[in-house]
Amino acid sequence: MKAISRRRARECTLQALYSWQVSKNDVKEIERYVVTEQDIQDCNISYFHELYIGVISCAEELDKLMIPHLSRNLEKLGYIEHSVLRIALFELTKCNDIPYKVAINEAIELVKIFGAEKSHKFINGVLDKIANQLCVSTNNHIIK
């Protein structure tokens, strides 16, 4: 599977999660909109679906995992930063085929494109702390 297709799936997931947080529209309607109306060229649609539905279904669990590592209240996080952290944490904890370094680097790249100017430093710090907490194994995967 091409890396670009997963990267594009992460971008589409971020856009869908942002829309979901801001609009509170139906999850399936947002997914349908992204798939039919957005530029999904080079996007791995099945990975987009896995991430989007997975992050939403695990949102509370992912938030609980990040809260102890935030330097501010969860409510003070911007929608982009919050969504990027959720995507990365989903990949760290639920996607065994993704090395933890890839999940963290992809999150940093996403927030550099879509987030505030210095958000990548914040995201990197939070994810690094969480990865260490989750006991990173020697084969670059998180031990569950």
UniProtKB/Swiss-Prot annotation:
<protein>
    <recommendedName>
        <fullName>Transcription antitermination protein NusB</fullName>
    </recommendedName>
</protein>
<keyword id="KW-0694">RNA-binding</keyword>
<comment type="function">
    <text>Involved in transcription antitermination. Required for transcription of ribosomal RNA (rRNA) genes. Binds specifically to the boxA antiterminator sequence of the ribosomal RNA (rrn) operons.</text>
</comment>
<keyword id="KW-0805">Transcription regulation</keyword>
<dbReference type="InterPro" id="IPR006027">
    <property type="entry name" value="NusB_RsmB_TIM44"/>
</dbReference>
<dbReference type="GO" id="GO:0006353">
    <property type="term" value="P:DNA-templated transcription termination"/>
</dbReference>
<dbReference type="GO" id="GO:0031564">
    <property type="term" value="P:transcription antitermination"/>
</dbReference>
<dbReference type="InterPro" id="IPR035926">
    <property type="entry name" value="NusB-like_sf"/>
</dbReference>
<dbReference type="Pfam" id="PF01029">
    <property type="entry name" value="NusB"/>
</dbReference>
<keyword id="KW-0804">Transcription</keyword>
<dbReference type="GO" id="GO:0003723">
    <property type="term" value="F:RNA binding"/>
</dbReference>
<comment type="similarity">
    <text>Belongs to the NusB family.</text>
</comment>
<keyword id="KW-0889">Transcription antitermination</keyword>
<dbReference type="GO" id="GO:0005829">
    <property type="term" value="C:cytosol"/>
</dbReference>
<dbReference type="InterPro" id="IPR011605">
    <property type="entry name" value="NusB_fam"/>
</dbReference>
